[in-house]
């Protein structure tokens, strides 16, 4: 599986490319194995920071409350769902996994539940948060490692970071960060 590019790292890459005379830019996208290929890409001339882009033609996205088929409002986080001709028909010889992943919604269409958290804005841009399985639950709160990593990575002394959950007998999990400092710090 993949993960999103942090806003800070994206800025660093774009600056590096520009400083070295490149005329290209980093363009984030999104795709799943179950959807054959990428299904969403950041338009070349319309970038929204933190977005993974807009859906390809004939590919539809919606965000639902986790564990349901209920759509959430714009800019509210939920599970990313996809629908369209490039979505798989099912997993080979695995009816249970197929039933857990492909679900018929009240709109009559079958939607792929990606297992990813994200949101959609009013312009149809998609924002990936992280894998649902990567979420850390500590003292009853949902903590998203990618959000903590973005904050840590924004510090001038930090080269990169990785945040994980570690078991805790009282809090269920505790947040643990691994940090690589820049040279000289």
Specify the residue positions occupied by each region the protein language model found:
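Gly/Ser/Thr-rich phosphate-binding loop
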Residues: 1-49, 60
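AMP-binding/adenylate-forming catalytic core of the ANL superfamily
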Residues: 84, 89-90, 100, 117-185
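Active-site glycine-centered loops adjacent to acidic/histidine catalytic or metal-binding residues
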Residues: 2, 31, 53, 116, ...
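Active-site glycine/GP-rich loop and adjacent strand/helix microenvironment
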Residues: 39-41, 53, 72-76, 89-93
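Short Gly/Pro-enriched turn/cap motifs at secondary-structure boundaries
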Residues: 50-55, 108-110
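Conserved beta-loop-beta connector loops within the AMP-binding
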Residues: 62-81, 104, 120-123
């Amino acid at each position: 599986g993949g993960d999103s590019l942090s806003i800070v790292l994206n800025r660093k890459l774009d600056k590096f490319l520009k400083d070295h005379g490149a005329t290209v830019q980093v363009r984030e996208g999104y795709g799943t194995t179950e959807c054959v290929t990428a299904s969403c890409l950041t338009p070349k001339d319309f970038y929204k920071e933190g977005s993974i882009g807009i859906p390809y033609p004939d590919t539809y996205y919606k965000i639902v409350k986790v564990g349901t088929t209920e759509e959430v409002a714009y800019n509210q986080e939920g599970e990313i769902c996809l629908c369209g001709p490039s979505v798989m028909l099912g997993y080979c010889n695995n009816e249970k996994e197929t039933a857990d992943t492909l679900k018929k919604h009240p709109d009559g269409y079958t939607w792929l539940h990606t297992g990813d958290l994200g949101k959609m804005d009013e312009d149809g841009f998609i924002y990936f948060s992280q894998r649902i399985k990567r979420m850390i639950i500590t003292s009853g709160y949902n903590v998203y490692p990618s959000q903590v990593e973005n904050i840590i990575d924004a510090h001038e002394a930090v080269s990169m970071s990785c945040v994980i959950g570690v078991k805790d007998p009282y809090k269920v999990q505790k947040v643990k960060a691994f940090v690589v400092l820049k040279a000289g710090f």
